């Protein structure tokens, strides 16, 4: 087996099953291998079967302390052999961000459970994918891990949609991401939150870092503590109460109202100037061009972003220990950039850990 395939198959961490019975009780029925009580409680909370509003969310995903979770939920048809179950959720935990891959695999596992009514077949398929990267079954469809490239998952969102909603204000999101600030996104529908938040890391494509994404967070003490341990993040919420938690964000996006708010404490670092205006115009121009694909828009933004780092390069020098490049603040000040540009470059150097300690 190719080394890349071996690496790919080692990404899954576990599989679990949650059921809602005819009495309306929701139970954690089975998992492989075992899981912690904390993670089990988190997954029960994320699974829509425990939700009081009784809305069915076919697929949700998110991250908790570097573990990604993917949950597919279905209603059990009357014809199924699962007579005492009205709904069930299949949960997969993994080390990687790839919603399309795990949505496809959980759908196959759902079909297996509907047909056999026992987790045994699911476990066999899970182990097959874990060890070989493939599971094949005539009636339930086959799944091949390597069909789902991580890069494809990174490109699956739509920057064009974000720009059509926020226009020039998209540059606020770009600036916040460049400076590794904390972005909180609210919308009452989890699907809208997930679609929007998963796209944001693509605005800073040079980092290709989706570990900053926490697309489904509850206002739960343990989850918030885990979130606040991260330096910068993109966090999605469906509870408007999060707007009253300024300790959680530098930038607040109310998707439902199409509003972006910069928190008072972040205003100094996020002050906008000529550089930001140019960046905003480029983002809007590129995204509104019907000839350009999503990946082309990302490329345009990445090239302009590289220019910003090129601006920073002349003011950096090798640190005393020779380990990394650090900012020469005097050289930056002597250049006499407009205040907003100098301020941004300084904060960018801080975000890139280029300040002298």
From Swiss-Prot:
According to the record, mutating residue 127 to E results in:
Impairs interaction with CCDC93
Sorted alphabetically, the keyword list is: Endosome, Guanine-nucleotide releasing factor
Gene Ontology biological-process annotations: endosome transport via multivesicular body sorting pathway; protein transport; regulation of early endosome to late endosome transport
**PROSITE patterns found in the cross-reference section:** DENN
uDENN domain boundaries: 1-140
Where is the protein localized? Late endosome
Protein name as it appears in the record:
DENN domain-containing protein 10
Entry similarity comment: Belongs to the DENND10 family.
What does the function comment of this entry state? Answer: Guanine nucleotide exchange factor (GEF) regulating homeostasis of late endocytic pathway, including endosomal positioning, maturation and secretion, possibly through activating Rab proteins such as RAB27A and RAB27B. Promotes the exchange of GDP to GTP, converting inactive GDP-bound RAB27A and RAB27B into their active GTP-bound form.
Indicate where this protein is primarily found.
Answer: other
Residue intervals of the dDENN domain: 301-357
């Amino acid at each position: 087996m190719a080394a890349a395939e071996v690496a790919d198959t080692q990404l899954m961490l576990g599989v679990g099953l949650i059921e809602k019975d005819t009495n309306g009780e929701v139970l954690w029925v089975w998992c492989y291998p075992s899981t912690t009580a904390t993670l089990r409680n988190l997954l029960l909370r994320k699974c829509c079967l425990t939700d009081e509003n009784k809305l069915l969310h076919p697929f949700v995903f998110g991250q908790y302390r570097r573990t990604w979770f993917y949950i597919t939920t279905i209603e059990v048809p009357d014809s199924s052999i699962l007579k005492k179950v009205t709904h069930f959720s299949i949960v997969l935990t993994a080390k990687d961000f790839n919603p399309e891959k795990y949505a496809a695999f959980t759908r196959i596992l759902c079909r297996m459970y509907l047909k056999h009514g026992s987790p045994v077949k699911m476990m066999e398929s899970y182990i097959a994918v874990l060890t070989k990267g493939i599971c094949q079954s005539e009636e339930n469809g086959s799944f091949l891990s390597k069909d789902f490239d991580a890069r494809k998952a990174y490109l699956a969102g739509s920057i064009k949609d974000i720009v059509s909603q926020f226009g020039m204000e998209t540059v606020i999101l770009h600036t916040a991401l460049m400076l590794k600030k904390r972005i909180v996104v609210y919308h009452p529908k989890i699907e809208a939150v997930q679609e929007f938040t998963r796209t944001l890391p693509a605005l800073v494509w040079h980092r290709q870092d989706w570990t900053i994404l926490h697309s489904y967070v509850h206002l739960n003490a343990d989850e918030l503590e885990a979130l606040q341990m991260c330096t910068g993040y993109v966090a999605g919420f469906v509870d408007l109460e999060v707007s009253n938690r300024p300790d959680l964000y530098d930038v607040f996006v109310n998707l439902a109202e199409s509003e972006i708010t910069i928190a008072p404490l972040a205003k100094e670092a996020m002050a906008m100037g000529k550089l930001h205006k140019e960046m905003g115009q480029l983002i809007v121009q590129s995204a509104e061009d019907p000839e350009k694909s999503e990946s082309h828009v990302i490329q345009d933004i990445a090239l302009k972003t590289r220019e910003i780092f090129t601006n920073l390069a002349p003011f950096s020098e090798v640190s005393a220990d020779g380990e990394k490049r650090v900012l020469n603040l005097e050289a930056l000040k002597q250049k006499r950039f407009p205040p907003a540009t100098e301020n941004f470059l300084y904060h960018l150097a801080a975000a890139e850990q280029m300040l002298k300690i």
